[in-house]
Amino acid sequence: AAGASPAAGASGGAASAGFHLAHLAGVLDRMLTYARGEPLTEQQLAALAAEGVPDPALTPGALADAFASGVDAALAQLRATDPATLTDARFVGRQQIPQTHVGLLVHAAEHTTRHVGQLLVTVRVAAAPR
């Protein structure tokens, strides 16, 4: 399925490949924003709200490009990170949950790894002969 819908019909309720790609790009963007010590913008909040909503205009190519751009931005931010700031406090969300700079960077990496794995399994299962 092209759109970033939360469930692909034949997948038994599992998240679709499109959802994983959209979520991957969004989580990277949000975690890196918090890691910089910044609040989310209205645009980021709107994108978060739209993540699980089917959108036929989101093609697989556009979703993959958005994720690739997110990875490029993450790598650039990591390269520019001053190691002296890694234990600095950062705050997440409207509730301002305390976290460390390094904690957010690690969480972004772990969450991305998890969803890439889920994406690969989803695509393999969807492509399997029936």
Residue spans for each PLM region:
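Short, solvent-exposed coil/turn linker segments
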Residues: A1-A2, D82
